[in-house]
Curated annotation (Swiss-Prot):
Protein's name according to its UniProt entry: MFS-type transporter phiL
Superkingdom: Eukaryota
Recorded GO CC terms: plasma membrane
Family: Belongs to the major facilitator superfamily. CAR1 family.
Membrane topology: Multi-pass membrane protein
Sequence segments annotated as region (Disordered): 166-185
Chain segments annotated as transmembrane: 25-45, 82-102, 111-131, 203-223, 238-258, 298-318, 321-341, 369-389, 390-410
PANTHER family per UniProt: MAJOR FACILITATOR SUPERFAMILY, MAJOR FACILITATOR SUPERFAMILY (MFS) PROFILE DOMAIN-CONTAINING PROTEIN
Keywords per UniProt: Glycoprotein, Membrane, Transmembrane, Transmembrane helix, Transport
Biotechnology: Phomoidrides A and B (also known as CP-225,917 and CP-263,114) are potent inhibitors of Ras farnesyltransferase and squalene synthase. CP-225,917 and CP-263,114 inhibit Ras farnesyl transferase from rat brain with IC(50) values of 6 uM and 20 uoM, respectively. CP-225,917 inhibits squalene synthase with an IC(50) value of 43 uM and CP-263,114 with an IC(50) of 160 uM.
UniProt GO molecular function: transmembrane transporter activity
Disulfide bonds: none
Function text: MFS-type transporter; part of the gene cluster that mediates the biosynthesis of the antihypercholesterolemic agents phomoidrides which are dimeric anhydrides.
Length: 423
């Protein structure tokens, strides 16, 4: 999990400089090589090191996906597409243990890595053939052909040369070639700098806390149902389904609600949707349109729902009420927590539109560190305070830190102007 948090920090800023496509290729090659090594490994040390390498290759692709989404999707539609991009990372940890157990039982554990390597190889093959470069620093809105062969798909290389030459000459494209993809210009600490920038930093901190709470619940869930209801291993596994279903529903459906609220506020402000579709954070400020308000109006109620359902889960579990009640609370928490988390992901991309991969890498770093911390401390807290009071304290912390994002909602203009004046 440490490498899952650290590697995207460097890969994100690199993709903002040299493009998404070459970094994607590097990540897939790294991931495939690690899986092949894991399948052939015979020592624990080798397994440990190769798992770190595997995490380095796989975790960075999540941030690249958010970067590609920011490249090709406008702010008016960003909610639904970022939601779709998050489905894979959400479903993976839920289905992975189940599928891994089946593969191990019938084929052996080595075949897990063989299948992963084969699947990644197929994706790499399709990526090399079809996936175009999307980084706007290099290709603008897609009309500027990239100069490097690494940034061109095989399909584009076989197109007629006349069209490519016309575009490459820069005619009718005043911003053609405005950015050069020089790896030496990459700042590996760019993602870390984002952590100290307003208004990104409070959003990332709040998002990391939301993820840590989610991780604390899921990591303690097996113990809770086994200790309070004496569930066996099969029933403990089934108890993850409600929170997983709620999470998936939020990931798939919440983006449409976020986009609807964006259009509603744009129309209310008298901004034509064709203009509003391309607004970034600063453009919205000049037009009197608050992009963060469009996102937070959905996120804040979702946090309230998540807090209430978390309290319901903890106290009904402590009182040992029928298990259907805490399971229903888990379903609601899965929806509320994921809805809030996805809204904040969209807002992070909105604020850092030109460097989305670096910003999401910073978000990933905080998310993984706080998530690991949440998973580490939750069981000692439950042993000392009990289920009910532990999650009551966590809900209270979540509510106390909510002003971090409400501060953005109500005092955004004043603080932003103060920062601009000081600069």
């Amino acid at each position: 999990m440490v490498f899952q948090g650290l590697s995207p920090t460097f890969v994100g800023s690199l993709s903002d400089t040299i493009g998404r496509r070459p970094v994607y290729i590097f990540c897939f090659v790294t991931y495939i090589a690690a899986n092949v090594g894991l399948a052939l490994s015979n020592s624990f040390i080798a397994l440990l090191l190769l798992r770190c390498l595997q995490s380095t290759g796989s975790s960075s692709t999540v941030n690249l996906a958010y970067g590609v989404t920011a490249d090709v999707v406008t702010s008016a539609e960003r909610g639904r597409y970022i939601g779709l991009a998050s489905v894979g990372p959400i479903i993976g940890p839920s289905l992975g243990p189940v599928l891994g157990g089946v593969i191990t039982q019938y084929l052996g554990w080595r075949y897990i890595f063989v299948i992963l390597a084969a699947a990644a190889l197929i994706f790499l093959f399709l990526l090399i053939i079809f996936f175009p470069e999307t980084c706007r620093n290099l290709v603008g809105n897609g009309s500027i052909p990239p100069k490097s062969l690494w940034n061109r798909s095989l399909v584009s290389l076989f197109k007629k040369g006349s069209k490519l030459e016309d575009h490459a000459s820069g005619r009718n494209l005043p911003n053609a070639g405005s950015k050069k993809s020089n790896p030496r210009n990459t700042n590996p600490l760019k993602a870390l700098n984002v952590l100290f920038e307003y208004p990104t930093s409070p959003v990332i901190i709040f998002n990391g806390l939301s993820y840590a709470i989610y991780y604390a619940i899921t990591s303690s869930l097996s113990y809770s149902f086994h200790d309070n209801y004496y569930f066996d291993d099969i029933h403990v596994g089934l108890s993850y389904i409600p929170i997983g279903v709620g999470t998936i529903i939020a990931a798939l459906g919440n983006g449409f609600v976020v986009d609807w609220n964006y259009r509603r506020l744009a129309n209310k402000a008298g901004i034509d949707i064709d203009q509003g579709r391309h607004m970034d954070y600063e453009t919205g400020k000049r037009l009197g349109f608050s992009i963060e308000k469009a996102r937070l109006q959905i996120a804040v109620p979702a946090v309230v729902v998540a807090c209430i359902s978390m309290l319901g889960y903890a106290w009904t579990m402590s009182l040992r009420l029928p298990p259907i009640i805490p399971l229903l609370c888990l379903f609601v928490f899965g929806w509320g927590g994921t809805a809030a988390y996805s809204c904040m992901n969209v807002l992070i991309v909105d604020i850092n539109y030109s460097s989305a991969a670096s910003a999401t890498a910073a978000n990933n770093l905080v998310r993984c560190l706080l998530g690991a911390g949440g998973a580490a401390v939750i069981m000692p807290l439950i042993n000392v305070l009990g289920m009910g009071w532990t999650f009551t304290a966590i809900a209270g912390l979540w509510v106390l830190l909510s002003p971090l994002v409400l501060f953005l909602l109500f005092r955004r203009e004043e603080v932003y102007d103060e920062i601009s004046d000081s600069e």
